[in-house]
From Swiss-Prot:
Highest taxon listed in the record's lineage: Eukaryota
Coiled coil: none
Pathway per the UniProt entry: Amino-acid biosynthesis; L-histidine biosynthesis; L-histidine from 5-phospho-alpha-D-ribose 1-diphosphate: step 6/9
Protein name: Imidazoleglycerol-phosphate dehydratase
EC number of this enzyme: 4.2.1.19
Matching SUPFAM superfamilies: Ribosomal protein S5 domain 2-like
Organism: Candida albicans (Yeast)
Listed GO MF terms: imidazoleglycerol-phosphate dehydratase activity
PANTHER family the UniProt entry points to: IMIDAZOLEGLYCEROL-PHOSPHATE DEHYDRATASE, IMIDAZOLEGLYCEROL-PHOSPHATE DEHYDRATASE HIS7
Amino acid sequence: MSREALINRITNETKIQIALNLDGGKLELKESIFPNQSIIIDEHHAKQVSGSQYINVQTGIGFLDHMIHALAKHSGWSLIVECIGDLHIDDHHTAEDVGISLGMAFKQALGQIKGVKRFGHGFAPLDEALSRAVVDLSNRPFAVIELGLKREKIGDLSTEMIPHVLESFAGAVGITIHVDCLRGFNDHHRAESAFKALAIAIKEAISKTGKNDIPSTKGVLSK
């Protein structure tokens, strides 16, 4: 059974469309939310196409695109993210709503937590930076994010929004994540290693076991 999802989320602050396949492969949208797709696609978005993955992330915030691209790539997903947000105000609504919408898509694509490992962990270095992530597909939304970022912004993304994106994602999915940057002095490296570590942990947690059981002593995974 294909683990795919399509999410459309519209508020007064953002308009978002996400297509996700947790196992990679071909992915496409029937219709873009952008009025003129050829104008939107430029050097500021993250796109990568291979035989096993299709990734195209366009949030309007370059560094957010870069982080979500890294998350998708190392999780093994195929992912399309389109967002039109009120960036004339600031980056908050766009970053938060993309995190929420991505979480909604992940939850829909994963379906019942059954026949998967449930737990995952990962370490990822980027030069001097090293991050650790641990994931529990618990249906218990909780996020502990400690990245130690010092700059006010990386590109056009406020550093305070980087952990908030991950918190919003975990809350929308209903999972527990712990993400820590253990060392590093370059904030770009610290953030990117954190997203890559989370990707590795997620890839393990959603991997199929070949069984059809619910990975819980309770026999259920629900609030």
